[in-house]
């Protein structure tokens, strides 16, 4: 019997395999989620570098959110990553939800990033 962590890793691998087919050189917007926090990175897989990142562990987000593990905080992280992506010169990305459902905090982060100007 597989553990929940192994199931998550298998789902994430399945999602990333599909993303590689459609990426066409675009960087990947990768989401990592825990019970208390959420973080996101824009990764250029061809060069193997992180172009921008944002998290609920940052002082700006902690100061403006009541809690770091809710939908409101995820939306703030989405806005922050959109701003940092613009500074890094990134507009088009491929959204990598990992093994997480596109619902709740993951969806709030994605919607806020789209509102901030990222295209995916």
Swiss-Prot record:
SUPFAM superfamilies: Translational machinery components (SSF53137). It comes from the Bacteria. Keywords: Ribonucleoprotein, Ribosomal protein, RNA-binding, rRNA-binding. One of its GO terms (biological process) is translation. Signal peptide: none annotated. GO terms for molecular function: 5S rRNA binding; structural constituent of ribosome. The keyword Lipoprotein does not apply. GO terms for cellular component: cytosolic large ribosomal subunit. CDD domains: Ribosomal_L18_L5e. Gene3D superfamilies: 3.30.420.100. PANTHER family: 39S RIBOSOMAL PROTEIN L18, MITOCHONDRIAL (PTHR12899), LARGE RIBOSOMAL SUBUNIT PROTEIN UL18M (PTHR12899:SF3). Part of the 50S ribosomal subunit; part of the 5S rRNA/L5/L18/L25 subcomplex. Contacts the 5S and 23S rRNAs. NCBIfam families: L18_bact. This is one of the proteins that bind and probably mediate the attachment of the 5S RNA into the large ribosomal subunit, where it forms part of the central protuberance. Belongs to the universal ribosomal protein uL18 family. This is Large ribosomal subunit protein uL18.
């Amino acid at each position: 019997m597989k553990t929940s962590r192994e199931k998550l890793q298998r789902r994430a691998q399945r999602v990333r395999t599909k993303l590689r087919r459609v990426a066409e050189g675009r960087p990947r917007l990768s989401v990592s989620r825990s019970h208390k926090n959420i973080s996101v990175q824009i990764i250029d897989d061809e060069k193997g570098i992180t172009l921008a990142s944002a998290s609920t562990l940052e002082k700006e987000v902690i100061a403006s959110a009541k809690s770091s593990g809710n939908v409101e905080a995820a939306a703030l992280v989405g806005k922050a990553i959109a701003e940092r992506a613009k500074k890094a010169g990134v507009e088009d990305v491929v959204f990598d939800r990992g093994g997480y459902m596109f619902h709740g905090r993951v969806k709030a982060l994605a919607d806020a990033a789209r509102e901030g100007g990222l295209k995916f």
